[in-house]
Each structure stands twice: as structure tokens, then as C-alpha cells.
From Swiss-Prot:
Pathway(s) this gene product operates in, as recorded in its UniProt entry: Cofactor biosynthesis; 7,8-dihydroneopterin triphosphate biosynthesis; 7,8-dihydroneopterin triphosphate from GTP: step 1/1
Ligand binding (Zn(2+)): 109, 112, 180
Protein name per the record: GTP cyclohydrolase 1
Classification of source organism: Bacteria, Pseudomonadati, Pseudomonadota, Gammaproteobacteria, Enterobacterales
Matching PANTHER family: GTP CYCLOHYDROLASE 1, GTP CYCLOHYDROLASE I
GO cellular component: cytoplasm
Reaction equation(s) it catalyzes: GTP + H2O = 7,8-dihydroneopterin 3'-triphosphate + formate + H(+)
Source organism: Pectobacterium atrosepticum (strain SCRI 1043 / ATCC BAA-672) (Erwinia carotovora subsp. atroseptica)
SUPFAM superfamilies assigned to the protein according to its UniProt record, in alphabetical order: Tetrahydrobiopterin biosynthesis enzymes-like (SSF55620)
Single GO molecular function: GTP binding
Entry's EC annotation: 3.5.4.16
Alphabetized UniProt keyword annotations: GTP-binding, Hydrolase, Metal-binding, Nucleotide-binding, One-carbon metabolism, Zinc
Main EC class the enzyme belongs to: hydrolase
Keyword Metal-binding appears in the UniProt entry: yes
HAMAP family associated with the record: FolE (MF_00223)
Length: 220
């Protein structure tokens, strides 16, 4: 972890301490080795499915999937990709809720490796520092780019922001469609799942909680 940013290490350690880190076996192999090994295994899977890898349309599929896994949809497994975060001194003494709604996210169900497609609402009440609004989006995206369950994703975003901002007053809500439900199994095309994680005043103060939940309902 020595080559990682201070913020990445802080967040990783906070998640480990709370039992909320994504289950990993150990240190990641280097990026190129991961891509090579994934492509080899995907080739074998496609062969087992009797797909003709000699066909022009399929020949590069194992390599494409390997690149997609490592560089894109599972890039959040590598804390080297954690967004650069700068916490700005709260010189204006802002003490009201800051809310960002409709943060789009795509993730991957860790049970079936199919898509989770949703939106997040994130809010916090500043203490000593504030964070650039786009960084909230980037943190949501970082933790989305992993095999996930929605409940853990919601809590990971919460703890990351609490750790970076130095305050418990953070709230996160995610509303998402799970393609493991929509495209297979029950094949329910209309249901959505909502998860909410509240900290500090968002949990202890009914008025603060209701203000946040009104913001969540605003986009529904």
C-alpha cells in the first residue's frame, strides 16, 4: 500500500476495521499479468461453450473482456485508481446540508457478474472541511467499479466520505435495477432496490433525516 495516496490508505483501513471491505485474497497481480490470465481463462470458457474463436467477431473477445475487467468495470478493486481527493478548509463555516442527487452508477452483481444500474444521492454536513462536488461522483464510481452487493456499496461510500471529511454526518442512498433479477431468474423488469446508510445527525436527528429523504424522493 506504500505507493498509494494517503486518502486511499485511510479509506481502505477504515473499511477493513469495520468489516466492509470487498473480500480480497491478497495483493493484486500487476495490471498486464491480470489481463493476460483473464484472457486465457475467458478463452477456455468460450471453448467450453463451443464458441468458434476463429470467427472474426469472437477472436478478440477474451482480450476485450480482460481489458474491460481490469481497466474499467473492476478497476475499483485497485486502490491505485482511487480518485485524487483534496479536502478544502471550510472557511465559510458552512453548516447546512450539501446534497448531490442523481449520481449515475453502474456496478456488477458479485453473485452473477451481471449489471447493477442505478443512481445515488449523497449528502453531508460540513465540519472542518468540504469536498469538491465532482469528487463525490468519483468516489461513488470508484466503489461501483467492483463486484458488489448494493448494501455494502452504500456503506462503503458512507464510510469513505466520513473518513475523508472527518465527520459522521454523511448519508447515502442508492436506487438501482439489478439485472440478475431483470434478465435471469424471476425476470422482473420493473422492480428496483433502494438502500440507505445514515451517519451522525442523519441517524440521530429526525429533522435532518427527513430533509435528506425528501431530497432522495425528489428524483423518484
Amino acid at each position: 500500500m506504500s505507493s498509494l495516496s494517503k486518502e486511499a490508505v485511510m479509506v481502505h483501513e477504515a473499511l477493513l476495521a469495520r468489516g466492509l471491505e470487498t473480500p480480497l485474497r491478497g495483493a493484486l497481480l500487476d495490471r498486464d499479468t491480470r489481463k493476460q490470465r483473464i484472457a486465457e481463462h475467458m478463452t477456455e470458457i468460450m471453448n467450453l461453450l463451443s464458441l468458434d474463436l476463429g470467427d472474426d467477431s469472437l477472436a478478440e473477445t477474451p482480450t476485450r473482456i480482460a481489458k474491460m475487467y481490469v481497466d474499467e468495470i473492476f478497476s475499483g478493486l485497485d486502490y491505485a485508481n482511487f480518485p485524487k481527493i483534496t479536502i478544502i478548509e471550510n472557511k465559510m463555516k458552512v453548516d447546512e446540508m450539501v446534497t448531490v442527487r442523481d449520481i449515475t452508477l453502474t456496478s456488477t452483481c458479485e453473485h452473477h457478474f451481471v449489471m447493477i444500474d442505478g443512481k445515488a444521492t449523497v449528502a453531508y454536513i460540513p465540519k472542518d472541511g468540504v469536498i469538491g462536488l465532482s469528487k463525490l461522483n468519483r468516489i461513488v464510481q470508484f466503489f461501483s467499479q467492483r463486484p458488489q452487493v448494493q448494501e455494502r456499496l452504500t456503506q462503503q461510500i458512507l464510510v469513505a466520505l466520513q473518513t475523508l471529511l472527518g465527520t459522521n454526518n454523511v448519508a447515502v442512498s442508492i436506487d438501482a435495477v439489478h439485472y440478475c433479477v431483470k434478465a435471469r431468474g424471476i425476470r422482473d423488469a420493473t422492480s428496483a432496490t433502494t438502500t440507505t446508510s445514515l451517519g451522525g445527525l442523519f441517524k440521530s436527528s429526525q429533522n435532518t433525516r427527513q430533509e435528506f429523504l425528501r431530497a432522495v424522493r425528489h428524483h423518484n
